[in-house]
Amino acid sequence: IIYCLGITELTTGTDNVRSMGNLSMLTGNIGREGVGVNPLRGQNNVQGACDMGAYPNVYSGYQKCEVPEIRKKMEELWGMEAGSLPDWYGSTLTEQINECGDPIKAMYIFALNPVVSYPDSNHVMRQLDKLDFLVVQDIFWTETCEHADVVLPGCSFAEKDGTFTSGERRINRVRKAVDPPGDAKEDWEIFVLLAEKLGLKGFDFKSPEEIWDDLRRVTPSMAGCSYARLEKPESLHWPCPTEDHPGTPILHREKFAAADGLGTFFGLEYRPPAEVADAEYPFTLMTGRLIFHYHTRTQTDRSKILHYEVPEGYVQINTEDAKRLKIADGERIKLRSRRGESLPLARVTDDVAPGVLYMAMHFPNGANMLTNTALDPLSKMPELKHCAVSVEKIEGGN
């Protein structure tokens, strides 16, 4: 089973993933080649970022923050006083957006453009403007930079050394091809300089390899993945706990990671989306992507060819709906939701069902002006893929 973000960006996203796990175990399709549940992550190295502890509730290698023994171990390895690490964990970015101004006074946004990519763009902009201080670090100017007090220039994959980890847990070496332009620096260098300015100890790294070795020291599942081993063409899959361990290309061959070695089935009940079409907002808007653009177009819109293919956003509307509303193909129309409005071009098609609209998420003042901030109760993922909207013909919309 291979899935992507579409089934997770709903208030039932966790249930959807659990359903696939149930199906995989029920049919015996797990623990061997060519089977299992395999997520295609939203972009390169999402797996690697999560492995490093980018979640608010885990340290590197998915070591849980709330476990006292793990906190004690991390404090000892990092040379911290006993009890220094908190026994609670933080919130997700979607939750943090709601907390801007109170209690969050300052925010450091790194390689992200939430003004376009997060639901209810109007709300995101209002909340960011409540901050006393906002730093944005990115490789190009974005819509989020417009709200920043300081913008720091990072660099792209081709301008830095390090590792990327694929969805199959394969750790790949990344090697710098060219130097960063101008004042841009590798991300780790910016963090080291910032730590120095703040007077923080333990950040005096000189290279990505030093950082990686420090990570291996505190992360049992990656302890055996030295740079010397990663230089080899076949690379390594974690878990790889020792230098002589071959890595683990396939998980759950003999047993599951649970204490009893057994898999867990989840009993699930159907739950509708948080927001469904009604008399006031009679259309269901589904969001997704286009092949010509990537995420918020921070990179792809700088390509003349890709910009030429799709210079601005559009919404697909069923032929019968367009006929009933007297909307012509290529006409600009108004979409409204309970959160905002957007003015895309209409693309009349039979590729969507009556009562359903489809709109890509790449563009500012587009789909995420409309989408819902309702969260999955477990993952805290917002319901980006589904909301209720109305459609209005604009006089002179041509």
Show the residue positions of the predicted features.
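Generic structural signal for well-ordered, non-membrane alpha-helical segments
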Residues: 12-16, 20, 67, 86, ...
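Long, low-complexity segments enriched in small/aliphatic residues
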Residues: 47-55, 210-305
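Flexible loop/turn segments at secondary-structure boundaries
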Residues: 8-11, 44-49, 114-118, 142-145, ...
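Long, contiguous, secondary-structure-rich segments that constitute the structural scaffold
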Residues: 181-236, 242, 296, 300-316, ...
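Short beta-alpha connecting loops at secondary-structure transitions
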Residues: 153-155, 159, 169-181, 302
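Short, solvent-exposed helix-loop connector elements
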Residues: 2-11, 175-181, 203-206
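Catalytic alpha/large subunits of respiratory electron-transfer oxidoreductases
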Residues: 1-160, 198, 241, 285, ...
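Generic recognition of flexible, low-complexity loop/linker segments
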Residues: 26, 34, 91-99, 122-124, ...
